[in-house]
């Protein structure tokens, strides 16, 4: 007798007539007049539960089995048999059922066997992984993360762990969470009356990182190809379906790579991970296509079989201006494209994923390489049908004098970035990279509309529960 995951039973990896033990939670129980109960037991290893067939001859049938309700935890031992019923190929003829944990009050159990609204599930985020929806999201999230690691490993990249606490603002936007151990009731002040951060833990102002990019560049300029993958933080007071205060970012960085290399890497990466989900999580994707977004599977299949289009920002603006469509946000050269503009380009004009490149320098970060025209930078956004921007990246500015000039234009103190500038002083090279918001990727794959529902415990303005 061996303990096996439910997935092994349902997917035929356990021989018929083999005695096994499965451990999990009750999804449903139904009883027949013939003295047989049917337990649907899930353990999270796959989408479907396994059916355990329990005869009333078991010694604890009346006292325990007949009192099992949704959410109770059980250990079921029995033989794997071919299932005569529809819906699954195999079931377990139970010879023993142990109750590991009861649900205290089935009538008030928050995850009772019924469909709950997505808003309600956010209020019980500690229990929502027990639902079909969030369980499927969690498995897809895992598969995407593993596929990203696998892709970069196969491509010869090194994974670099960049710091979560930083004194640098990568985006230059100032929307950062401060990290401090100062006594808020008795803040030290300097001669100018300002908070004296010399007295703080790090001896200077410190923040939670908005990006691992700058640190990642230092390792790319030594190991050639690296990526970072971890949590990042933005103190944007944005209560939208696309924003989180804490989210995960994937950021590759490649030495000796230009913008075209960057675009090719982004395309190869996305197609690789989408194929992985289609192959490895067919059960969960079937659920998303049936219950969340009927186009979920077809969208990914189209994506992986379609070549990316490319267009300069200037031409993209011209396309939008002459398309005849009235947009909520006006279009003109110099404006940052909004989601409606991005989706029009990807869904209606190109009908394919599209890389928009060479944006006006005024709307992009200081580290992006200035183009020869002096007006645009070698930036790119990858736009996906159905969501808009899914990746943002650029070729980095490797020329020290140009980098210093851009910092001055944006009011940044170059001394704060002395170590970043050193990369341009000692063996500088062209290099490129991009950022992928992991939760937006999961939302795109699953069809789930709000990024709060694709991360275990969402952090948003005025919400840091659990």
Swiss-Prot record:
Lineage top rank: taxon: Bacteria
Major subcellular site: cytoplasm
Cellular component terms (Gene Ontology): cytoplasm
Keyword match Ligase: yes
GO molecular function terms listed in the Swiss-Prot or TrEMBL record: asparagine-tRNA ligase activity; ATP binding; nucleic acid binding
GO biological process: asparaginyl-tRNA aminoacylation
Cellular localisation: Cytoplasm
EC class: ligase
Presence of keyword Cytoplasm: yes
Catalytically driven reaction(s): tRNA(Asn) + L-asparagine + ATP = L-asparaginyl-tRNA(Asn) + AMP + diphosphate + H(+)
InterPro entries: Aa-tRNA-synt_II, aa-tRNA-synth_II, aa-tRNA-synth_II/BPL/LPL, Asn-tRNA-ligase, Asp/Asn-tRNA-synth_IIb, NA-bd_OB-fold, NA-bd_OB_tRNA
Keywords assigned by UniProt, alphabetized: Aminoacyl-tRNA synthetase, ATP-binding, Cytoplasm, Ligase, Nucleotide-binding, Protein biosynthesis
EC number: 6.1.1.22
Subunit text: Homodimer.
Homology family: Belongs to the class-II aminoacyl-tRNA synthetase family.
Alphabetical list of HAMAP family matching this protein: Asn_tRNA_synth
The name this protein goes by in its record: Asparagine--tRNA ligase
Upper lineage: Bacteria, Pseudomonadati, Pseudomonadota, Gammaproteobacteria, Enterobacterales
């Amino acid at each position: 007798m061996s303990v096996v995951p439910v997935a092994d039973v349902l997917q035929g990896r356990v021989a018929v007539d083999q005695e096994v033990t499965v451990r999990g939670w009750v999804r449903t129980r139904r009883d027949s007049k013939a003295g047989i109960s049917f337990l649907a037991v899930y353990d999270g290893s796959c989408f479907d539960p396994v059916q355990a067939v329990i005869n009333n001859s078991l010694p604890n049938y009346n006292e325990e089995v007949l009192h099992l309700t949704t959410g109770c935890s059980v250990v079921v031992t029995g033989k794997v048999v071919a299932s005569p019923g529809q819906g699954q190929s195999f079931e377990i003829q139970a010879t023993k059922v142990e109750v590991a944990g009861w649900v205290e009050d089935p009538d008030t159990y928050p995850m009772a066997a019924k469909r709950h609204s997505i808003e309600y599930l956010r209020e019980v985020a500690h229990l929502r992984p027990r639902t079909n929806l969030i369980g499927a999201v969690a498995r897809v999230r895992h598969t995407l993360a593993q596929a990203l690691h696998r892709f970069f490993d196969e491509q010869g990249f090194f994974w670099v762990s960049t710091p979560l606490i930083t004194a640098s603002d990568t985006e230059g936007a100032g929307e950062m969470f401060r990290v401090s151990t100062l006594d808020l009731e008795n803040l030290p002040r300097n001669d100018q009356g300002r908070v004296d951060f010399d007295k703080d833990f790090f001896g200077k102002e410190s923040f939670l990182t908005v990006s691992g990019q700058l640190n990642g560049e230092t390792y790319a300029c030594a190991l050639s190809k690296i990526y970072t993958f971890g949590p990042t933080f933005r103190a944007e007071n944005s209560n939208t379906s696309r924003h989180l205060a804490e989210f995960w970012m994937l950021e590759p960085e490649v030495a000796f790579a230009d913008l075209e290399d960057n675009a090719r890497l982004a395309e190869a990466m996305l197609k690789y991970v989408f194929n992985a989900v289609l192959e490895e999580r067919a059960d969960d994707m079937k659920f998303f296509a049936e219950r969340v977004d009927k186009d979920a599977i077809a969208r990914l299949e189209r994506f992986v079989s379609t070549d990316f289009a490319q267009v300069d920002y200037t031409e993209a603006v011209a396309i939008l201006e002459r398309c005849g469509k009235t947009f909520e946000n006006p279009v003109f050269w110099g404006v940052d494209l909004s989601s409606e503009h991005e989706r029009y380009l990807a869904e209606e004009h190109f009908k394919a994923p599209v890389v928009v490149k060479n944006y006006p320098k005024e709307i992009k970060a200081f580290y992006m390489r200035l183009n020869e025209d002096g007006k645009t930078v070698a930036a790119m956004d990858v736009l996906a049908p159905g969501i808009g921007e899914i990746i943002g990246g650029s070729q980095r500015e490797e020329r020290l004098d140009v980098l210093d000039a851009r910092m001055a234009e944006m009011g940044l103190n170059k001394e704060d970035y002395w170590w970043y500038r050193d990369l341009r002083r000692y063996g500088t090279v062209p290099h490129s990279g991009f950022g992928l918001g992991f939760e937006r990727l999961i939302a795109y794959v699953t069809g789930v509309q709000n990024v709060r529902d694709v991360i275990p415990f969402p952090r948003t303005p005025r919400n840091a529960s659990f």
